[in-house]
Amino acid sequence: MSLLSKTRAVTAALLICCCLPATAGAAQTVVLHTSFSPNKLGASTTVGFSFTIANTGGGLPSPLTGLSLHLPAGIDYVTTTLGLSICQPAELVERGLTGCPPNSRIGYGSALVEVPFGQGSGHEIPNIEALMGPPHNGNIVVLFYANGQEPVYAQIVFQGELLPGSGSFGGSLETAIPLIPSVTNGPPVSILKVESTIGPSHLTYYKHVHGKKVAFHPRGVSVPLSCPRGGFPFSANFSFLDGTSTVATTVVPCPPPSRRR
């Protein structure tokens, strides 16, 4: 091999190493936070959740590929009026949010990502919308629409399915996370942080009353009627592109007892 060829090979190897999202032998750690707003037994609520991903080796975490969020038992999904309309995935892909009715929106969020060749501070995807999708096998389906701009330009649609739970968990939102390219045909970005809500907070729906369009706020899922000792448990399983996985847990504290009048 000529000196020029060796130099090119070494340069290519260095570039590949610089673009790797995590160092060899390192693993991902996740911190999970959840909330009920309001946190009152039996009340309509907005469920908030967020997570932060880091790499034990100090580099970027491996791209996230799957998330299973396990929700506390006793949450009432029957009385909610979230998702009175259905958003069709094909319309969402083709037309974006304009392709779906306002009454299909069920939550909001944002994400912080980093490109493999970035400086580590992260770039925000400020708009992630959660919408009610067509049910699958009788299960609730949540569509997520992420609208990324510079430097990560991407409009991505992916979905989660609410599966029945067991034990202390009443359901599991199973979501496959698509890889987000950093540039066209480039390596995927790493997700550093996600914040999201499912519930009526900041949502406005519309209905027709006597021929007039009237705005109203939908009813969210309900906080369980009783709180187990230690609080409402949440757990999440995270899967990554490098084949590793990890589990994060947290609790929402039990609400204070109601004051007797």
Labelled PLM ranges:
Residues T11-P21:
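Bacterial N-terminal signal peptides
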Residues G25-R261:
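Ser/Thr/Pro/Gly-rich, low-complexity intrinsically disordered stalk/linker tracts of secreted
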Residues M1-T11:
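Bacterial N-terminal signal peptides that target proteins for export
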Residues L4-K6, T23, L131:
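A generic signature of intrinsically disordered, low-complexity regions enriched in glycine/proline
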